[in-house]
Amino acid sequence: MANIGKWNAPSATVTVLSTGLNSLANATMSAASSNIANQTNLDIYVDVEVVLASLSPTTGAFVALYILESIDGTNFPAQSDADLRLTTTQLLVAIPVGTTATTAQRVAARNIVIPPGLFQIKLDNQTGVALAASGNTVKFNAYDVNLNG
């Protein structure tokens, strides 16, 4: 049957943040990721996986991912972290960390819309504790929809 939308196979899983998360203090943002280029693939969606090495998050803990888009293909917004937190239009996703157990945490969010251009990501640690000295990652799996079935 023609004209049925189906998922396309996702792109390769890409680690967008890793060592920049090491020992990241609570209520602190990471440095921006390397540039993530979506000008060619023009993927629409991304699934995000955040792995936090062993920690004891507090009740209500979460991590937030902010997106910095380069509208002109060269320059990125230069907001302070405090201002970025007030700019909800640049909040990509907030992901709850649903346990306070002392263990590694693996949390994910699905079907997040991404821009058709160059962008970077920052992680805001709101877990109530500093992240571990190693083993923390943010990974993306980008994909789109085939509308020709």
Language-model region placement:
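Short consensus segments that form the blades of beta-propeller domains
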Residues: 55-59
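Terminal beta-strand-rich extracellular "head" domains
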Residues: 66-105
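Signal that preferentially marks extracellular ectodomain short beta-strand elements
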Residues: 31-36, 53, 106-111
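Solvent-exposed, flexible loop/coil segments flanking beta-strands in beta-rich domains
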Residues: 1-42, 49
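Beta-sandwich interaction modules
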Residues: 91-129
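C-terminal interaction-tip segments
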Residues: 1-16, 116-118, 124-149
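Intrinsically disordered, low-complexity boundary segments flanking structured domains
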Residues: 34-36, 78-81, 128
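Internal, hydrophobic beta-strand segments that form the core of beta-sheet-rich folds
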Residues: 42-52, 62-69, 114-138
